[in-house]
Structure formats: structure tokens, C-alpha cells
Amino acid sequence: MRGRWHFRCFSLALSPAAPDLVLRKPSIFTVQTEIFTLCDAATVAAGKLNILGSFDTIGAQSFPCDHPLCAVACKLRFDVGEEGRHWLEMHFCDPDMRPVLKPIRQDFEIRIPGHQSQTHIHIWQHLGFHLELPGEYYFELKVDGDTKSRIPLYVVQAQRR
């Protein structure tokens, strides 16, 4: 999923009665992941997502080790036509794609007044986890069962000073 792009297309239609060009929005909707990041902390204030210390690498002097505290911040965009009940799930897997944490699930509802897309912000706070070995771990975001984003967490052997 890394580096995957979603393109929105508009189609042109010519009507015999009105030969002017008409732009039509696509009829297929896709939830868009605007932000999905591992960070030191995150908050929402006045509808704004505030992220402190986004990172993708941690080091440990020895293994196994514990990472005591972090957060994962997520901002999704829903288009008109995607109203209703949804659920999201966050998975954290080791380099062999085995779960490090139990999947964390949240149910929510999207309401779209008018014709403007809406965002949903979710923050998983106070995450702590146990890491057996160095390697490339993954946080994966699923919306309604579909994988929307996967980000790496690089766990490395820290250099002694």
C-alpha cells in the first residue's frame, strides 16, 4: 500500500439539447487517508489535528525492549455518498506480520450536510508495546475492512556512546 495514489477523474458529457461541456463527478467513492502517522502525542482542538513529534524509527540498546508511550494519529476524508456507519481498525504487526498488539477497533458515523466532503479524526493515545527484535514493523489502518494505509516503524539497534 505504500506509495499508492488515488486519482479522482471527471468525465465530460455532451448533451444534444445543450452542446456545452458538463463536468460530472465520479460515481465511485473512496475513503481517503489524509494523515496516518506514529507520533509522541496528538490532540484535537477546534477541529484541528495537532501532531507532536511524528517519527518512523526508534532505537534500543538491547532486545527485547519496551516502548512505553506513543500515539497514532489518523485523519480520513469521506465524500458525499459515503454517509452512514463505518468502522476503523488499527493493527500493529512485527516484521513477520504477526500481531504485536490486539487490533483496536472504533465504530463511528459520518454525516455530510450539504455537498462538501467531511473528515474524521481519530487518535490512539498511550500506546505502549513490547518489541522482541530489531526490524521493520508495521501499523496498518483498515476502514470497513479495507486496508487504507500501512506505515513502517523501523526498530534499530542504538549505537552506544
Language model segments and positions:
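Leucine-biased recognition of intrinsically disordered, low-complexity hydrophobic segments
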Residues: 12-14, 21-23
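Intrinsically disordered, low-complexity segments enriched in proline/serine/threonine
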Residues: 18-21, 28
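Contiguous segments within soluble domain cores/interaction surfaces
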Residues: 25, 29-134, 138-161
